[in-house]
Regions:
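Conserved NTPase motor "head" modules and their coupling/switch loops across ABC/AAA+ ATPases, GTPases
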Residues: 1-31, 171-312, 321-325, 329-332, ...
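Nucleotide-state sensing region of NTPase/ATPase domains
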Residues: 47-130, 136-146, 203, 207-208, ...
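C-terminal lobe/lid and adjacent interdomain/linker elements of RecA-like ASCE P-loop ATPase modules
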Residues: 79, 88-90, 325-366
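Conserved lysine of the Walker
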Residues: 35-36
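Long, charged N-terminal accessory/stalk domains
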Residues: 122-123, 129-178, 182-185
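Walker B catalytic acidic pair
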Residues: 316-318
Length: 366
């Protein structure tokens, strides 16, 4: 799949700008705070309808504008298609694909993206929330139902959290606590099945990439960790649901005392091992960066296997954070699909990839 052209109107620092991309590598250069990440953010939104930097659409609208528009011509599934995302703070968001109204979750049927930014280099060392976000973002693009379950789970989690925090002042809130707990158990069961399956594929895809990078000196292993009472995360949703309910029953009193949700998929994590040792605790910075690179490149391969097309790869100022060896490893692995690379200076990337160079200054693309 290819983003052929994108037009931005009132989006971030872009007043009105149109840019055409090459089908292969595109190097987007410019000094800091000129709009490089904003452009990648707009492309990312074509796959999911949301930003990777903020939860609030109003922050995407440029100063002095009442709304923002993203209009793109894309080539996917062997045909040209158009995507139009209209952001109107206070009025909601409107998404059109080929002129037909769609939900944000349906965008993934047209465009898929894999984003790699500097924060992802800390994927191994950071907290579990970062790794859950990786799972959520990836699975939502290839399994639309997952996004629905995730949205439902988050809604229930927020309601239950408020009950646990306020029940002492309003004891009547406890009348609905079990209902929300049961709903969370049901939604968790679905999320766990999807996450377990994707984690297994990620393990299989990332291991050979990491082995190749380390000259066969390191073995990467990814294990999915979920609610302790879940005996088999690959079992049916019903079986997993009963296992989670067991955990919920054991921790109900502890939840009331701590005012926290202790049971559910919000505690999930990916455990990363290098040569059998926990990478988060014992791996060097170089090892964890290699593992993070391997995982992100594996995500790209999974999308290819799932859809028959490479997703659009977005490298947001990440190559500057890597040494020459790791830069070369990434650049040698990104053939076959479209890639957008942002950087402060070209630094020979375009020559090494044969890519097109775009220069951004104060929201103007040249």
């Amino acid at each position: 799949m290819i983003i052929m052209k994108i037009a931005l109107n009132g989006f971030r620092n872009y007043e009105f700008e149109t840019v055409e991309f090459a089908p292969g590598t595109n190097v987007i250069s410019g000094q800091n705070a000129q709009g490089k990440t904003n452009l990648l953010e707009a492309v990312y939104m074509l796959s999911c309808g949301r930003s990777f930097r903020t939860r609030f659409d109003r922050e995407l609208v440029g100063f002095g504008y009442s709304g923002a528009d993203i209009l793109a011509d894309v080539y996917s599934h062997e045909r040209e298609q158009t995507i139009n995302i209209q952001l109107r703070p206070g009025q909601g968001k409107k998404i059109l694909v080929n002129g037909v109204k769609k939900t944000a979750g349906e965008l993934a049927d047209t465009v898929n993206t894999v984003l790699f930014c500097p924060d992802d280099l800390n994927l191994i060392k950071d907290g579990a929330a970062v790794r859950r976000r990786l799972l959520d973002n990836a699975i939502s693009q290839i399994r639309p139902r997952y996004a629905e379950y995730l949205s439902e789970f988050n809604r229930l989690y927020e309601h239950k959290t408020r009950i646990l925090k306020d029940w002492r002042d309003k004891p009547s809130l406890l009348e609905t606590l079990d209902e929300f707990s049961d709903g969370m158990c049901r939604a968790s069961a679905q999320l766990i099945r999807y996450r377990a399956a994707f984690s297994a594929r990620l393990d299989q895809a990332a291991a050979p990439i990491h082995k190749d990078f380390s000259n066969s000196l390191e073995e990467l292993e990814i294990k999915y960790k979920t609610v302790s009472t879940v005996k088999d995360p690959f079992a049916s949703a019903r079986e997993i649901y009963y296992d989670i309910c067991e955990h919920q029953e054991k921790h109900r009193q502890a939840e009331l005392e701590s005012a926290q949700c202790l049971t559910g998929a919000h505690k999930d994590d990916l455990e990363i091992f290098i040569n059998g040792t926990a990478a988060r605790s014992f791996a060097s910075q170089g090892q964890t960066r290699t593992a993070a690179l391997s995982i992100k490149l594996a995500e790209r391969e999974i999308f290819l296997a799932e859809t028959g097309e490479y997703p659009v790869l977005l490298l947001d100022d990440v190559l500057s954070e890597l040494d020459t060896k790791r830069q070369e490893f990434v650049l040698n692995r990104i053939g076959g699909g479209q890639t957008l690379i942002s950087c402060c200076e070209d630094e020979g990337i375009s020559k090494r990839t044969g890519g097109r160079v775009l220069f951004i200054s104060e929201g103007t693309i040249k």
